Amino acid sequence: MSVIAGEIVEPYAAALMSLAQSKDLTDKFAEDVRSLINILDESPEFKQFVGNPVIKQEDKKAVVKRMLGEQVDPLMRNFLMLLIDKGRITFLEQIGKQYLALLRELNQTVLAEVTSTVELNENQKNTIRERVKSMTSAREVEIETKVDPSILGGVIIKIGSQIIDSSLQGQLRRIGISLKTL
């Protein structure tokens, strides 16, 4: 994230967290934020629409209200209208991710980004959760999964700046390096 984006994203995310805490809605807002991020990921057209500076704010508001309906909390809807009014709606995804990071910090939860060759089942996710808990001081572990067949097998787990590479691709790379040193 650029410095300018950080200067925009962090205050809005902190304000959203403050509002959520004051109304005891941190978990509801987290649900709403995840839904919004999914909408942005799944609909490049919507992302482009809200980010287009040529489109009038009133048109953006109407589309956002129509699209979300009653799915999000009214306070979250008001926050989105504020972002549109201030011309900051293009930062919605980053603000949402920063909000989730603040919530994880508040709840002493770590994010484990797991890359595997196939979709993980619940037992595998629970095993990873327990392993990550034992490695960190976190009370809870949130898992974000990504499927990447190029790792050939195994998993890659990223926790903050720490990476645990137990993929077949990583093992082959390490074997190749050790053979070169012989």
Swiss-Prot record:
- UniProtKB keywords: ATP synthesis, CF(1), Hydrogen ion transport, Ion transport, Membrane, Thylakoid, Transport
Gene3D superfamilies attached to this UniProt entry: N-terminal domain of the delta subunit of the F1F0-ATP synthase (1.10.520.20)
The way this protein sits in the membrane is described as: Peripheral membrane protein
Q: Tell whether Nucleus is among the UniProt keywords.
A: no
* Pfam families reported for this sequence: OSCP
The listed locations are:
Cellular thylakoid membrane
Per the record, its GO cellular-component terms are: plasma membrane-derived thylakoid membrane; proton-transporting ATP synthase complex
Q: Which GO terms fall under molecular function for this chain's record?
A: proton-transporting ATP synthase activity, rotational mechanism
Where does the source fall among the domains of life?
Answer: Bacteria
Per the record's keyword annotation, is Membrane included, yes or no? Answer: yes
Matching NCBIfam families: ATP_synt_delta (TIGR01145)
- Self-association and partners: F-type ATPases have 2 components, F(1) - the catalytic core - and F(0) - the membrane proton channel. F(1) has five subunits: alpha(3), beta(3), gamma(1), delta(1), epsilon(1). CF(0) has four main subunits: a(1), b(1), b'(1) and c(10-14). The alpha and beta chains form an alternating ring which encloses part of the gamma chain. F(1) is attached to F(0) by a central stalk formed by the gamma and epsilon chains, while a peripheral stalk is formed by the delta, b and b' chains.
Family annotation (HAMAP family): ATP_synth_delta_bact
Task: Tell me, in a sentence or two, what this protein's role is.
Answer: F(1)F(0) ATP synthase produces ATP from ADP in the presence of a proton or sodium gradient. F-type ATPases consist of two structural domains, F(1) containing the extramembraneous catalytic core and F(0) containing the membrane proton channel, linked together by a central stalk and a peripheral stalk. During catalysis, ATP synthesis in the catalytic domain of F(1) is coupled via a rotary mechanism of the central stalk subunits to proton translocation.
Q: Which family is it part of?
A: Belongs to the ATPase delta chain family.
* Protein name as annotated: ATP synthase subunit delta
Species name: Trichodesmium erythraeum (strain IMS101)
